[in-house]
Amino acid sequence: MRHRKHSNQLGVKKEHREALLANLSKALLTHGRIKTTLKKAKVLRPFVEKVITLAKNGSLHSRRMAISRVRDTDAVHGLFDDKVEQFRDREGGY
């Protein structure tokens, strides 16, 4: 049963939501901070945390999975090569 499995859909279709999250995460990884609405930020947080967890793994497969989610190779390479050291000791809540 899928009761209470509802995630916030932001009032848009699936493709629009995926593109929105990819663009917001690209901006966040590139600039370090962004200005957005509270609802979008609440949906973006677990999305970006999963990408950072992939970066902590550091394998080629993890890099490809992150590129498929964020859809920007430069932002992902910056995360995997430079920024991941900030998050090595943290277990979450980046």
Residue ranges and their predicted role:
Residues M1-V12, H16-A19, N23-Y94:
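Structured, basic alpha/beta domains of bacterial-type, RNA-associated proteins
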